[in-house]
Amino acid sequence: AIEAMREASKKGKSGFIWHTTGSGKTMTSYKATRNLLMDIPSIDKTVFLIDRKDLDTQTKLAFQSYAENDTIDVDDTDYVDTLIKRMMDDSRQMIVTTRQKMQIMVSKRLKEGTRQYEKIKGLKLAFVVDECHRAVTPQTKRDLERFFSNSLWYGFTGTPIFEENKYEQKGDLPQTTDQLYGNNGKPLHSYTIKEAIHDEAVLGFMVENLGPKGISPEQEECLYHTDTHMRSVLNVILNQS
């Protein structure tokens, strides 16, 4: 995944990484965010973008623990003012922040025509987004891309959205993961649940089917639609409400 992101960034391409939940996405995303900053001189800063405040703290602490013996600093942004300060700093940094703070900075705090506005707008950034569908909506990503026109985007997800399970969006907003992060219909790298179970990176599933005994599937289907069964279900619902 790290190498795939590096190669894509060298070509100025964005993309998404499909890694199953529990397979170590946080460590992978840290290394990927770090390597983009270290290996691609044209990138001014890398931004690890997340959604919720509790996840912000959790991820910040994880990143800082990874960076203890590393050669780069991880800067967190507790406040929007801190985010602006980090963005204005001339040093190349890896920043951990929430999309809410980024949105407030872009839409409310930066004033067009000011030195802050022009400098931050001109930065070449690489965004790495954890849980990319939850953290950044299609509209939010479009708004941020319009402001940061020199940006690359890499989304991590354990549950990509494909054509067959896409969500309806307003207008021409992206509906699938590929449309949102773009890589010609396929992830930059994938590590599926099947591979993770095989590698014993995550626990497997124990499937146990519960149902009526001694009844064929055809009989079960007929019994399911009888008035007696439907009344029984209705009684259970009413008694529990």
At which residue positions do the language-model features occur?
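RecA-like P-loop NTPase motor core of helicase/translocase proteins
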Residues: 1-241
